[in-house]
Design a protein with these regions (language model features):
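Helix-terminus/linker motif at the lipid-water interface of multi-pass membrane proteins
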Residues: 73, 77-96, 165-172, 228-235, ...
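Hydrophobic/aromatic residues within transmembrane alpha-helices of membrane transport systems
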Residues: 70, 82-86, 98, 123, ...
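Small-residue hotspots at the loop-to-helix junctions and early N-terminal turns
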Residues: 92, 96-103, 182, 241, ...
Length: 490
């Protein structure tokens, strides 16, 4: 970690602990100025050349993966900032409202993120083959697909908000808070789409640093606005939602303008802006299947959230905090799986099968090391991690969350392998297999969760155990399919 990152962490931690609002705002402002100076000194377009088809395999994947990991960490900070401050400032009901909203937000955003991810696989192949004309045509076609779906999704989520909240068995005392929070967040879905579209585009051509930098600016702004809106202006959960939307808008606008200026080879020309049906069909076959994978995954999580809600506010609050910790914990292997997918896709486009074989071996060893290390840290530190989100006086909530983390945290290697399998099949033009693995994993999780939770002697603990069992079954299916195909780079 360099001196810039250390100073940024110190500024943010100090801001959150400062007793006065003016002091918190001053610290956030200083952190922003520090990062502004960093941006001026860095020529970010030159930090990473983007070619993953040459050089050391392990080093190349790690250099590309690290900014993804840090970027996902910052992405999680959007919601964690809300959760942390809401839980401490507004109380358990507000925490339950924001936490139960998280699953629905992730489900909706996963649809257009899945579209962007699927298009990104095509971008990587074209970039690996050095087909820049085809890449620009694909950018325009994918913008039509992603933009259209996002607008429809935005309208639908606002129209059906109340019925969906009730379908999730949200307790009556929490429902008004959840509705207010979700309404504002869904109004701000378009900036989230714009940011992710350009972030996946730049990652496809091997630049994972630029999206990270704009996310960092956004997170600093998000935390500052959280403090201002909730502590200073007493806006409640509406303030938390407004802070997140405003920060995401800044990230989206900044990344769009920066990409246009600093990546001229990606800028669309008049000849590129045509309705290319073959390109649309190809992108649709990738993006829609990846979208199905992401939406199935998060729909399963949404069903589980509804089951969790039926156990009351204490379990809801514990689950809300523990899921945040969980998402941070397996983030390294998730983002390494995405980096691995881009690595495979570029080399697949370039015809480098020898490099793909060696990359698979390196990825398995690295994922195993990541997962085992994080599992040990989460298992040992579970009580302390829960106390970051929940007041120490809430002993029942902390105990429930610790039980969740002890069960999930013991099996992170299973989801690490699953992320590698998702990325591999997406990169070699088999996104349908990623959908199959998702159905196996989430189907097992949902069915077992409802079955085990219905047993009085098991209760909500059965929900926690259903997750690693689903990971294991999907891993077995994915490896079996790989071993059954002799042409899969062995």
């Amino acid at each position: 970690m360099n001196i810039f990152q250390i100073n940024m962490q110190k500024c943010l931690l100090f801001a959150l602990s400062f007793p006065k609002l003016w002091g918190q705002t001053l610290c956030i402002w200083c952190a922003s100025l520090t990062f502004g100076g960093f941006l001026r000194r860095k020529r970010m377009a030159d930090v990473y050349k983007g070619n993953l088809t040459t050089g050391s395999i392990t080093g190349t994947m790690l250099r590309f993966a690290f900014p993804l990991m840090l970027g996902n960490l910052l992405q999680q900070c959007y919601n964690v900032a809300d959760t942390l401050i809401v839980g401490r400032v507004l109380g358990a009901d507000a925490l339950a409202a924001v936490g139960s909203s998280y699953a629905l937000i992730v489900f909706v955003t996963s649809i257009f993120i899945g579209l962007c991810m699927g298009c990104s696989a095509v971008f990587s192949m074209q970039y690996g083959a050095r087909d820049l004309d085809g890449l620009r045509r694909s950018i325009f076609s994918s913008a039509l697909i992603v933009g259209g779906v996002t607008l429809v999704l935005n309208v639908a989520s606002l129209l059906w908000l109340t019925p969906v909240i009730r379908l999730l068995h949200t307790p009556p005392e929490v429902e008004p808070l959840a509705r207010s929070y979700l309404f504002i967040v869904f109004l701000g879905m378009v900036p989230v789409c714009v940011y992710n579209f350009y972030a996946f585009l730049l990652r496809a051509v091997g630049n994972s640093v630029v999206p990270l930098c704009f996310l960092l600016v956004s997170v600093v702004l998000n935390i500052g606005l959280d403090l201002l809106f909730m502590l200073g202006l007493h806006m409640g959960v509406e303030g938390a939602a407004l802070a997140t939307v405003a920060a995401q808008t800044v990230a989206a606008l900044g990344l769009y303008l920066y990409t246009r200026r600093r990546f001229p080879h990606l800028r669309l020309r008049k000849a590129d802006c045509v309705v290319d049906l073959p390109s649309i069909r190809r992108l649709s076959s990738y993006s829609l299947l990846t979208c199905v994978q992401q939406s199935v995954m998060n729909f399963g999580i949404l069903l589980v959230q509804g089951l969790v809600n039926s156990f009351g506010t204490a379990v809801m609050a514990a689950f809300a905090a523990a899921v945040k910790i969980d998402s941070f914990a397996y983030m390294p292997v998730q983002d390494f799986g995405n980096a691995f997918s881009t690595f495979i896709a570029q080399n697949f486009g370039a015809g480098r099968t020898d490099r793909i074989r060696r990359g698979i071996r390196s990825a398995v060893w690295l994922t195993t090391a990541f997962a085992l290390l994080v599992s040990a840290l989460v298992f040992v530190g579970a009580p302390w991690l829960m106390s970051l989100f929940v007041s120490p006086s809430e002993a029942e909530i902390i105990a429930i969350g610790v039980e969740y983390l002890h069960i999930e945290g013991s099996f992170y290697v299973g989801i690490g392998y699953l992320f590698l399998l998702y990325g591999f099949y997406r990169a070699v033009a088999l996104p349908s297999m990623s959908v199959v693995l998702t159905v196996v994993s989430l189907g097992t999780r949902v069915l077992l969760a409802y079955l085990l939770a219905s047993l009085p002697q098991v209760g909500y603990t059965g929900i926690w155990w259903s997750v690693p069992i689903g990971w294991a079954l999907a891993d077995i299916v994915g490896v079996w399919y790989y071993r059954s195909k002799p042409n899969f780079f062995r």
